[in-house]
């Protein structure tokens, strides 16, 4: 190999990255799209489980996998059997609102329920409520999107920002209503950038709901949010922050919480609608995880040897992972002061060191450059005889590594044919400049693949052979303290952390007297292990008794306390 061969250094360095195991990318599901508690109601709407939609990239509206609920109305006042298509979390507050709209006859008492002022005061919300009532009776394929409040700002002007709708949910709706569950309030007027003019509200002690017409709903989920200006009817005085909070967030005395507003969007019918439920609730299933995209095939190489080698590496190590760019903490000043010189991989010492080890990368610095800073003169092969001996050594080691690789258990079926083809293509034409490089490259690649496959075997056997020897340094099997952080479990309010304990230590014969309740089975296993017998699953130190723990959790609408069993380990033993 004449002259400095930096190309080989680059190839071998790349092989180190190429031989690292990689796995295809996996799509990650959002964990929030889970079924919630069944909502109970006393009216005529059948509301069962409420659902969140998953990540917007995981489903398309109108497809067979829409995460929607089909809700069927029943009762004497409704003859329709068509289901309601609802997307989003339908809490008991929205259920009560829709029940009230469905039952109302728009008399004076009904108008009071919705804080609608008497006729003649210009109420744009009344026609919209009547259209919503018509949809509840005859949905006609239209579907309702429920968006809940995400953020509120009080100063200087109240700003309400809601959830962003799912894909397709932001299309122009037939109607958009801001539904508020008010507390005690006064007669007020409401204006805002997303509202069609001034809307009047006449709140009384009998008002349960407050609805506002929104003509530009897209501003409700975009920053800064939906701006509202509330003034007293008559004198036009602005409401204070305390009055606004009491009006817009009514108290829920049953659950000791506040009722948050919701934005309802009624969207037009789509061509692909699910079949009617015929009196039953159907849930269109959530989308299954998408299969990971197939790895991009490398472009065909002009060299069949390199193309076959790439296929073998991917067959054994898996497709290359899309790793983030490496970040090296290098000091430019230190690098500038480092001795500069040529790296010569044709140097006899370099080649011998490369063959003596199995690492695909070798970093060399000539001794003269390290001491004096003067670059060393590149040295060529010692003699043709030495070069021939080195070639024979490469060929012998190549055949030995290939034989070991073929004998490894669990090898993919595609690997042996690819390996045979590589050996047939190597060393190729000995007179060509790439002949020696090809043999050396294949040797280092096969050594790396062999090391990786052996590492997989060792990790697998280590998982299966969790024996007493590995835990001997920790003493005999005994109960150890372990604190568990529950703050990641968002539904658990109290406690934030608790002492769960864990079991750790060696399982050997004779057993420790810390847990006298032995089983005959584990005694026999421990005696076999003491006699030197190999067990596929040696006895492990595990909890044998538990106690419960009182947890205070937050469900959709209430705070509850539960005594959860098997939360704290109290005894340990070998099993």
Swiss-Prot record:
Residues annotated as signal peptide: 1-24
Post-translational modification: Preproprotein is proteolytically processed to generate N- and C-terminal cleavage products that homodimerize and associate to form a biologically active non-covalent complex. Binding of the non-covalent complex to AMHR2 induces dissociation of the pro-region from the mature C-terminal dimer. The N-terminal portion of the protein, despite having no intrinsic activity, has the role of amplifying the activity of the C-terminus.
Chain positions carrying an annotated carbohydrate: 78, 344
InterPro entries, sorted: AMH_N (IPR006799), Cystine-knot_cytokine (IPR029034), Muellerian-inhibiting_factor (IPR021203), TGF-b_C (IPR001839), TGFb_CS (IPR017948)
Main location: secreted
Keywords in alphabetical order: Differentiation, Disulfide bond, Glycoprotein, Gonadal differentiation, Growth factor, Secreted, Signal
Propeptide stretch(es), residue numbers: 25-466
Molecular function terms, GO-annotated: growth factor activity; type II transforming growth factor beta receptor binding
Residues annotated as site: Cleavage: 466-467
GO terms of biological process kind: anti-Mullerian hormone receptor signaling pathway; gonadal mesoderm development; Leydig cell differentiation; Mullerian duct regression; negative regulation of ovarian follicle development; ovarian follicle development
Record's subcellular location: Secreted
Chain segments annotated as transmembrane: none
Expressed in which tissues: Expressed in fetal testis and adult ovaries.
Pfam families: AMH_N (PF04709), TGF_beta (PF00019)
Disulfide bonds: 477-541, 503-572, 507-574
Gene Ontology CC: one annotated term: extracellular space
CDD domains attached to this UniProt entry: TGF_beta_AMH (cd13757)
PANTHER family per record: MUELLERIAN-INHIBITING FACTOR
Chain's role: Plays an important role in several reproductive functions. Induces Muellerian duct regression during male fetal sexual differentiation and plays a role in Leydig cell differentiation and function. In female acts as a negative regulator of the primordial to primary follicle transition and decreases FSH sensitivity of growing follicles. AMH signals by binding to a specific type-II receptor, AMHR2, that heterodimerizes with type-I receptors (ACVR1 and BMPR1A), and recruiting SMAD proteins that are translocated to the nucleus to regulate target gene expression.
Family to which this protein belongs: Belongs to the TGF-beta family.
Subunit structure: Homodimer; disulfide-linked.
The protein's name in its UniProt record: Muellerian-inhibiting factor
Gene assigned in the entry: AMH
């Amino acid at each position: 190999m004449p002259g400095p061969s930096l190309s080989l250094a680059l190839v071998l360095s790349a092989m180190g990255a190429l031989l690292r195991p990689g796995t295809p990318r996996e799509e990650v599901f959002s964990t929030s799209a889970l079924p919630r508690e069944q909502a109970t109601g006393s009216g005529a709407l059948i509301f069962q489980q409420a659902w969140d939609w998953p990540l917007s990239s995981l489903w398309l509206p109108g497809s067979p996998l829409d995460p929607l609920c089909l809700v069927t109305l029943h009762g004497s006042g409704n003859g329709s059997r068509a289901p309601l298509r609802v997307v989003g979390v339908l809490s008991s507050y929205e259920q009560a609102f829709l029940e009230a709209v469905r039952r109302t006859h728009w008399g004076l008492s009904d108008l009071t329920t919705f804080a609608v002022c008497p006729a003649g005061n210009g109420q744009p919300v009344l026609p919209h409520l009547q259209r919503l009532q018509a949809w509840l009776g005859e949905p006609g394929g239209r579907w309702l999107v429920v968006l809940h409040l995400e953020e509120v700002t009080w100063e200087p002007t109240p700003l309400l920002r809601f959830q962003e709708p799912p894909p397709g949910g932001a299309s122009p709706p037939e109607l958009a209503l801001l539904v508020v569950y008010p507390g005690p309030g006064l007669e007020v007027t409401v204006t805002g950038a997303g509202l069609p003019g001034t809307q009047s509200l006449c709140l009384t002690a009998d008002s349960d709901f407050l609805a506002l017409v929104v003509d530009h709903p897209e501003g409700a989920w975009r920053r800064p949010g939906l701006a509202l200006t509330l003034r007293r009817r008559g004198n036009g005085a602005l409401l204070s922050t305390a009055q606004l909070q009491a009006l817009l967030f009514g108290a829920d005395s049953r659950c000791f919480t506040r009722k948050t507003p919701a934005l309802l969007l009624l969207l037009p019918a789509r061509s692909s609608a699910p079949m009617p439920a015929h009196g039953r609730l159907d849930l269109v299933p959530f989308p299954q995880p998408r299969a990971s995209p197939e790895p991009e095939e490398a472009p065909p190489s002009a060299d069949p040897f390199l193309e076959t080698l790439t296929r073998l590496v991917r067959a054994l190590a898996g497709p290359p992972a899309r790793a983030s760019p490496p970040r090296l903490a290098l000091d430019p000043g230190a690098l500038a002061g480092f001795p500069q010189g040529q790296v010569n991989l044709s140097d006899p010492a370099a080649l011998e060191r490369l063959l003596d080890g199995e690492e695909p990368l070798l970093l060399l610095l000539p001794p003269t450059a390290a001491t004096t800073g003067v670059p060393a003169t590149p040295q060529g092969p010692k003699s043709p005889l030495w070069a021939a001996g080195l070639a024979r050594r490469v060929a012998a080691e190549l055949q030995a590594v290939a034989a070991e690789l073929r004998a490894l258990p669990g090898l993919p079926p595609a690997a042996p044919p690819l390996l045979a083809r590589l050996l047939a293509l190597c060393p190729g034409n000995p007179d060509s400049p790439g002949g020696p490089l090809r043999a050396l490259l294949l040797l280092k690649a096969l050594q790396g693949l062999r090391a990786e496959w052996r590492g997989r075997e060792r990790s697998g056997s280590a998982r299966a052979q969790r024996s007493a020897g590995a835990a001997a340094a920790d003493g005999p099997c005994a109960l150890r303290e372990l604190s568990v952080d529950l703050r990641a479990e968002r539904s658990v309010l109290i406690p934030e952390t608790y002492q769960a304990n864990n079991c750790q230590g060696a399982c050997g014969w004779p057993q420790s007297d810390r847990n006298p309740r032995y089983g005959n089975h584990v005694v026999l296993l421990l005696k076999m292990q003491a006699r030197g017998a190999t067990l596929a699953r040696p006895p492990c130190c595990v909890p044998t008794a538990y106690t419960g723990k009182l947890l205070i959790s937050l469900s959709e609408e209430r705070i509850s306390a539960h005594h959860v069993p098997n939360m704290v380990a109290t005894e340990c033993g070998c099993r």
